[in-house]
């Protein structure tokens, strides 16, 4: 499902990955681990065509990454960055933005599914009526996971999805991701959390 073949990623004169290869089969829940600065986030971005690929090959599903296939690849992927910047005033506006990416409209049925997902992540549906400034970073992370699931993408790429969470909230996220894996999703997540990684089906060590 996801594959890199001898890739190198370089920012200016700094090479963060050199000759790296990996393979993630469909339906795998994989955790990327390694020391700070070793290229974990860059690897996630490489699958989206967002990292400066110096050499090597990246494949997502049936596509080999190129300027011609980036758009098709991104339509298969749900991406949650670690530093989540949402340039909107309200939670509702953020939801509508994500839904537009998937050509979806916010209606009663979408709200019903979204509220179910929020509950699974330990969040109340009244969060949908709040301003973004009123919710914490950890709530934003969980809220965005609930929204991204509406897009029904085959691949989930997550950068430190539990970093800002307490133990209880972290466990909500892990349970939610394991449920997505059972539904056939392929999940690749960066994490420093030993408990999180212990529940994954594969480890990508950098």
Q: What role is predicted for each listed range?
A:
Residues 131-135, 139:
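Conserved ABC ATPase signature
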Residues 89-104:
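Q-loop/switch helix immediately C-terminal to the Walker
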Residues 156-160:
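Catalytic Walker B motif of ABC-type/P-loop ATPase nucleotide-binding domains
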Residues 52-64, 73:
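Conserved ABC transporter NBD signature motif
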Residues 108-127:
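Conserved ABC ATPase "signature" region
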Residues 48:
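Helix-to-loop junction immediately C-terminal to a conserved catalytic motif
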Residues 167-169:
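Helix N-cap at the start of a conserved alpha-helix in ABC-type nucleotide-binding domains
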């Amino acid at each position: 499902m996801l594959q890199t073949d001898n890739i190198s990623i370089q920012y200016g004169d700094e090479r963060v990955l050199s000759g790296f290869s990996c393979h993630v089969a469909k339906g795998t829940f994989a955790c990327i681990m390694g020391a700070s600065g070793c290229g974990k986030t860059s690897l996630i971005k490489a699958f989206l065509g967002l990292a400066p690929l110096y050499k090597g090959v990246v494949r997502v599903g049936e596509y080999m990454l190129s300027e011609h296939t980036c758009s098709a690849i991104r339509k298969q992927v749900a991406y949650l960055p670690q530093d989540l910047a949402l340039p909107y005033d309200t939670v509702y506006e953020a939801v509508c933005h994500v839904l537009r990416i998937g050509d979806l409209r916010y209606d009663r049925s979408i709200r019903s599914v979204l509220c179910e997902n929020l509950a699974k992540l330990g969040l109340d549906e009244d969060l949908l009526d709040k301003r973004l400034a009123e919710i914490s970073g950890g709530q934003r992370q969980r809220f965005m996971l609930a929204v991204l699931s509406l897009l029904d993408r085959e691949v989930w790429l997550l950068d430190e999805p539990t970093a800002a969470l307490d133990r209880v909230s972290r466990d909500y996220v892990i349970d939610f991701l394991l449920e997505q894996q059972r539904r056939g999703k392929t999940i690749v997540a960066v994490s420093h959390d030993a408990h999180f990684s212990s529940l994954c089906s594969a480890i990508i060590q950098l």
